[in-house]
Amino acid sequence: MATQRASGLLQRLAQGSLVKQILVGLVLGILLAWISKPAAEAVGLLGTLFVGALKAVAPVLVLMLVMASIANHQHGQKTNIRPILFLYLLGTFSAALAAVVFSFAFPSTLHLSSSAQDIVPPSGIVEVLRGLLMSMVSNPIDALLNANYIGILVWAVGLGFALRHGNETTKNLVNDMSNAVTFMVKLVIRFAPVGIFGLVSSTLATTGFSTLWGYAHLLVVLIGCMLLVALVVNPLLVFWKIRRNPYPLVFACLRESGVYAFFTRSSAANIPVNMALCEKLNLDRDTYSVSIPLGATINMAGAAITITVLTLAAVHTLGVPVDLPTALLLSVVASLCACGASGVAGGSLLLIPLACNMFGIPNDIAMQVVAVGFIIGVLQDSCETALNSSTDVLFTAAACQAEDERLANNALRS
């Protein structure tokens, strides 16, 4: 009897709402950090294991899914990568533009006294682009080991096209391997409530939020701008694409992708979550198996906001005059930098000196701005990743649904 009850409880847990279970894990994590700091730090291992498992499975998932998708692609079957890529770039530029408007409407100032040492930012936008190109010709084993998604995509696409000329049994084997990896991903995702419990507990216990109060205004501007993009700008772009109420799709992506990304703080770790959501939304597998890992690499609206807001905060602090053309140029530079953020160790923060260079701000001061970014990183990085990752699914879904509707309308006319 006891065994039956235990198995029944496990079955209910396995089949229950994952979002509700995550909320329970979140509340329990906050309570544990409040009750016992040492215990909260100890259970941080659960969060580390969860994020590690996601990061471990994500590169293999991308390689197998893209390879299987291209190898089994039927001649004449259309994918929607081009419109999704356009949405990615337009969304990133719109986010940078919104950040410029926000920064001028609510100017922030910084206390530039600390220094960031042992950090070497890229010397220019050319170096960022060069880094991306070098990532494309990486050794496949090295790309898998270091989670270099540009390199993984290049090898997966190349092998996929090569396997189109292979035997059907070979294609079936690749497809079966892809399904096996997908099963492993679903298994890892079921442990999300436990992982988030550990992440929340350890974060609150080790960092707390007392150090953030000194940068409250800057955080309000940053997070407010990200909310504006998530709840106004992105829905407008989606409405332009699907011509109906975008908010059910927007909230679904924020709830089922953004929540995970907020706590894992890793676009790469969130790739399996986004893949699972795309499958749940019944999107075209040939499309999302390419667009999701591509989005994790170049769709960086949150990074564009971070670069723009922190750069203009430094500009306002130093009293550097900024005219409209320069502000627009900053939006373009921030967008280009953001698209290369995944190829730079330290991400968006280490690309701030590039943007600061536009205004003649010395590198030592720019690195102090980077140091401020690391201080507020607990919230800034979480919100940035949540926006970046949820937007990957949102734009993929919008493009796929728009294409499905177009095909349905054409069928009705004929």
Swiss-Prot record:
SUPFAM superfamilies found in the cross-reference section: Proton glutamate symport protein (SSF118215)
Family, similarity comment: Belongs to the dicarboxylate/amino acid:cation symporter (DAACS) (TC 2.A.23) family.
GO biological process, one term: threonine transport
Protein function: Involved in the import of serine and threonine into the cell, with the concomitant import of sodium (symport system).
The keyword Transmembrane helix is annotated on this UniProt entry: yes
Family matches, as PROSITE patterns: NA_DICARBOXYL_SYMP_1 (PS00713)
Keywords annotated in UniProt: Amino-acid transport, Cell inner membrane, Cell membrane, Membrane, Symport, Transmembrane, Transmembrane helix, Transport
Record protein name field: Serine/threonine transporter SstT
Reactions performed catalytically: L-serine(in) + Na(+)(in) = L-serine(out) + Na(+)(out); L-threonine(in) + Na(+)(in) = L-threonine(out) + Na(+)(out)
Gene Ontology molecular-function annotations: neutral L-amino acid:sodium symporter activity
Chief localisation class: membrane
Residue ranges of the TM segments: 16-36, 46-66, 84-104, 143-163, 180-200, 219-239, 300-320, 332-352
Membrane topology: Multi-pass membrane protein
Taxonomic lineage from the root: Bacteria, Pseudomonadati, Pseudomonadota, Gammaproteobacteria, Enterobacterales
InterPro entries, A to Z: Na-dicarboxylate_symporter, Na:dicarbo_symporter_sf, Ser_Thr_transp_SstT
Entry-linked Pfam families: SDF
Domain of life where this protein originates: Bacteria
Location(s), subcellular: Cell inner membrane
One GO cellular component term: plasma membrane
